[in-house]
Amino acid sequence: MAARGVIAPVGESLRYAEYLQPSAKRPDADVDQQGLVRSLIAVGLGVAAFAFAGRYAFRIWKPLEQVITETAKKISTPSLSSYYKGGFEKKMSRREAGLILGVSPSAGKAKIRTAHRRVMILNHPDKGGSPYVAAKINEAKDLLETTTKH
């Protein structure tokens, strides 16, 4: 072991670095400090860039928030209003049958059959449609055809 105040050989200085005198410098100490300084500068620049980006985002967010909400209101209102919002009634009425097939309740038999064919092609159970919805479509067609005079 190296005694206090005595500089040990090179191999021993690495093993017992804590016993070196405070004034004695290791040859690789400058390289470590330069790397540490560079790392600290890089971290500082990264934090500054992040802060500027956050500041810019907060400034631009208020006007964008208003534009986004207005656009969402414009998109959702007209495009979704044409769809019927609600389930099926217990006993089907002519109005509901017309809504299901997409025709007027007073439409003729030819128009009802055409609408039924078009809707059933889209909702047929063999093509992945729901059997319940297909039954309601058929029920709507039967109801409208039995009450139509033409």
From Swiss-Prot:
Topological domain ranges for the Mitochondrial matrix compartment: 58-150
Transmembrane segments: 35-57
Protein name, per record: DnaJ homolog subfamily C member 15
Residues in J domain copies: 96-150
GO molecular function: ATPase activator activity
Entry GO terms, CC: PAM complex, Tim23 associated import motor
Positions of post-translational Phosphoserine modification: S104
Residue ranges, Mitochondrial intermembrane side: 1-34
PANTHER family linked to this entry: DNAJ HOMOLOG SUBFAMILY C MEMBER 15 (PTHR12763:SF7), PTHR12763
Subunit: Interacts with the TIM23 complex. Directly interacts with PAM16/MAGMAS; this interaction counteracts DNAJC15-dependent stimulation of HSPA9 ATPase activity. Associates with complex I of the mitochondrial electron transfer chain; this interaction may interfere with the formation of supercomplexes that facilitate the transfer of electrons between complexes.
GO annotation terms (biological process): cellular response to starvation; mitochondrial electron transport, NADH to ubiquinone; negative regulation of mitochondrial electron transport, NADH to ubiquinone; negative regulation of protein-containing complex assembly; protein import into mitochondrial matrix; protein-containing complex assembly; regulation of lipid metabolic process
The UniProt record lists the keyword Nucleus: no
Keyword Protein transport (UniProt): yes
Chief place of localization: mitochondrion
Record keywords, A-Z: Chaperone, Membrane, Mitochondrion, Mitochondrion inner membrane, Phosphoprotein, Protein transport, Translocation, Transmembrane, Transmembrane helix, Transport
Localization, UniProt: Mitochondrion inner membrane
Domain of life: Eukaryota
Membrane-protein topology: Single-pass membrane protein
Natural source organism: Pongo abelii
Function: Negative regulator of the mitochondrial respiratory chain. Prevents mitochondrial hyperpolarization state and restricts mitochondrial generation of ATP. Acts as an import component of the TIM23 translocase complex. Stimulates the ATPase activity of HSPA9.
